[in-house]
């Protein structure tokens, strides 16, 4: 049996398989029918400093090989999370990581400070795909200045592991990755959803209330793989790969491209136990190929012809 443990900065994971924010609730919802402690980590749903109601319905749409969502970061706020959710998840025997969102640098900082007070939360994941209301709604993560500004501010107040989730809706994701690395990010996770749209031809109207939304699922996997591979060769901090992963083979591909760990997102809606199957599949793959540790896969892509 291969060793499956990996590290994200100073954060040890029992294996590289984690669930993505917004696709697995707070983890406890699945505890009755799967052993969630087997996971390398659980990224809990996006949290903001103030409660958010989310966008109007309809806010989800099925697409070929994927789905669009425009949920709008619906959550009850950081105080509610600390008082009501944290006590229920703090003793789960895996890494519980909070996805943090904001509408300004200040709200990111406030939320990060609140989560930092929770002893059993070892890391946060900054969602920098959120629009900056002070800059006309442009997402923080689409410019090096915007991404660097929010990471620098959060790094000042957040002493634990800081993971930054990168947007694919950019010209060169490696420049964004280098900018957040320079401002103190311990790791980057990529990719977030791609901007997409669905139209009802009969009604001649957009399907989503927000017109556009985030595209995820198997359709984005080739783009995600390419961006992970490019980023692996651009930064020194560890990469968490995500985007269209639905089985152990996908996970292996992301690790070969340079990911130290992976997140499973959309496929949790198809099979909530998929992450356990991926863990077992990774172990089998390593055994079949003679790898003593899953770490040997990281960046091991052979590009020679």
From Swiss-Prot:
Pathway: Pyrimidine metabolism; UMP biosynthesis via de novo pathway; orotate from (S)-dihydroorotate (NAD(+) route): step 1/1. Keywords: Cytoplasm, Flavoprotein, FMN, NAD, Oxidoreductase, Pyrimidine biosynthesis. It is an enzyme of class 1 (oxidoreductase). The active site is at residue 130. It catalyses: (S)-dihydroorotate + NAD(+) = orotate + NADH + H(+). Pfam families: DHO_dh. This is Dihydroorotate dehydrogenase B (NAD(+)), catalytic subunit. It comes from Parabacteroides distasonis (strain ATCC 8503 / DSM 20701 / CIP 104284 / JCM 5825 / NCTC 11152).
